[in-house]
Amino acid sequence: MLAYFFPDTLILPVFGNNDTKFHDNPIPDEDRAFFYDYVYRLWFQMLPGNAKMLTKEHQDHIKRTFMAGGYYRVDLTDKISILAMNTQYYDSLRDPNVAGDSGMMQMDWLKR
């Protein structure tokens, strides 16, 4: 529907709590590569506005962080950026101090 009604519009989706296999939980490590690649293609290559408005270089930049944990940045101008965070990695059951944890990697990325 988005492609039909907004073919020339940049659409920047983010994950909600019911957008993964197990509601309110991030993607399990064993499913991560397949899931994020599938969603990346839907959101950034198949939505016509995104495919038209984002350069290949920008899509590659988005894909690097998106594949790591479903988060990304889009620079609209040299002074305005959109940060799309995947907050499913932040709950009371996850240890944020585990090296390689997607939530910690996202925070490290955000600090840069």
Where would I find each of the regions flagged by the language model?
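Extended active-site neighborhood of metal-dependent phosphoesterases/phosphodiesterases
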Residues: 2-109
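Short acidic, glycine-rich surface-loop motifs adjacent to enzyme active sites
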Residues: 112
